[in-house]
């Protein structure tokens, strides 16, 4: 919780100065001539397509609430959680209609949802908490439900060396965080009876987002 607060509670003015108008702090989808905001909304469309017309949705790590607000506008009953006071205040002010924004740890989530979404949150947890994160998905997802998880992956052949050292991002941007490798994430899902389907890799879009 201290790591989350140290990073995300720097003040919303700081993030508004350099994020796009949707306040999306994650990779967009297919950034191009129509601009970053359009690419972020394209990502939301893609995530919404993956979960279908789910009536009850949980978002783990909701950031400034853009995706939650988007899903609510499409008719979903959305519960969105974060540990950042600054993010939650901004989210409630801009996307409060139809969304239940909560300051809550994902480990404390108890409910049954038709769909779960999480965008670039698992990287902040640290390796020891990856199983707990997947426990949360399995516990709170209704039978037949869908989860759409966007995450930044580390290649298997680079992971061991990466995990043994602290790079610039771990030291100065996301203390306590670690990028997950897809093989490990998939194993954790399948061990809990979750089917791993429809994987889409778009790492190149992250580079374009940062540009």
Predicted regions and their residues:
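N-terminal auxiliary segments of SAM/dcSAM-dependent transferases
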Residues: 1-17
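Conserved class I S-adenosyl-L-methionine
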Residues: 54-61
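Conserved SAM-binding loop of SAM-dependent methyltransferases across substrates and taxa
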Residues: 64-75
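Conserved SAM-binding strand-loop segment of SAM-dependent methyltransferases
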Residues: 96-107
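A short acidic, Gly/Pro-enriched loop at the edge of an enzyme's catalytic core
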Residues: 107-116
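A short glycine-rich, Lys/Arg-flanked "PGG" loop and its adjoining helix->strand segment in the class I
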Residues: 131-143
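Conserved beta-strand signature within the Rossmann-like core of class I S-adenosyl-L-methionine
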Residues: 144-152
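Substrate-binding/catalytic lobe of Class I Rossmann-like enzymes that use SAM or dcSAM, i.e.
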Residues: 153-211
């Amino acid at each position: 919780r201290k790591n989350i607060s140290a990073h995300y509670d720097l003040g919303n003015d700081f993030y508004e100065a350099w994020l796009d108008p949707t306040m999306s702090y994650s990779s967009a989808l297919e950034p191009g001539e129509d601009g970053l905001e359009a690419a972020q909304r394209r990502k939301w469309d893609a995530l919404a397509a993956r979960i279908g017309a789910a009536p009850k949705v949980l978002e783990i790590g909701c950031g400034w609430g853009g995706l939650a607000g988007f899903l609510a506008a499409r008719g979903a009953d959305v519960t969105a959680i974060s540990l950042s006071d600054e993010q939650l205040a901004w989210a409630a002010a801009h996307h409060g209609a139809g969304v239940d924004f909560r300051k809550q740890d994902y480990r404390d989530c108890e409910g049954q949802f038709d769909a779960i979404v999480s965008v670039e949150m698992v990287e902040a947890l640290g390796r020891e908490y990856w199983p707990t994160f997947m426990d949360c998905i399995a516990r709170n997802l209704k039978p037949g439900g869908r989860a759409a998880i966007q995450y930044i992956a580390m290649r298997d052949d680079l992971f061991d060396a990466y995990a043994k050292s602290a790079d610039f991002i771990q030291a100065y941007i996301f203390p306590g965080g670690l990028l997950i490798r897809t093989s490990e994430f998939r194993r954790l899902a399948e061990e809990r009876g979750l089917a791993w389907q429809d994987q889409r890799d778009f790492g190149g879009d992250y580079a374009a987002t940062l540009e």
